[in-house]
Amino acid sequence: MMPENPIAAVMGSGWTASWPSASLAAIWLAWLLSWLIGAFFSGRTEKHVRAWDARGFHIPIVIGAILLMPWTASALAERPLWRVGTSGIYVLAVLTAAGCLFTWWARLHLGRFWSNAITRKEGHRVVDTGPYGLVRHPIYTGLIGALIATGIAGGTATALLGVASIAFGFWQKARMEEGFLTNELGADAYGLYCRRVPMLVPFLPQG
């Protein structure tokens, strides 16, 4: 008996059980490339968190990204917990795209204050309009939403664990970022913003 073709195994892993699921890969690739290109358009950094201190959120994000990859489930010979079908893939692809577009809305609205790292930019101030009036970290909110949709499309336990790990990493990063910005921008400015606007979930009542 011939061994299973590894390419065929990936094609049946849940991500690519039907051709529309290729749109998920296209969405993420387009988002990643555009995000990397956008990194060249940012304001001058005056202060940043040390790379060593950032390991607390980098590690779960990297681990989660590995778990989310369809090849991980294939290597583990993992079967999907469910299959969403062609229509489901379409819906989840739209939700994934919506989450990615939300991140770009937030990034463009933040303008020159954006950075992939935790930094204070030249002339930095609190931005509390647009998506930043809904949540304090709309980029993370959009990414987590897009990842949840992608994880559901994958339908494997490793994909869902990957989403949870990445979400935890973003939560850790958000907490570190808020401590940094409170110190840099002042408790009166940023602290008041934190008390008024939810961290990641829109419309969540603040204590």
Predicted regions, residues:
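Solvent-exposed interhelical
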Residues: 124-135, 139-140
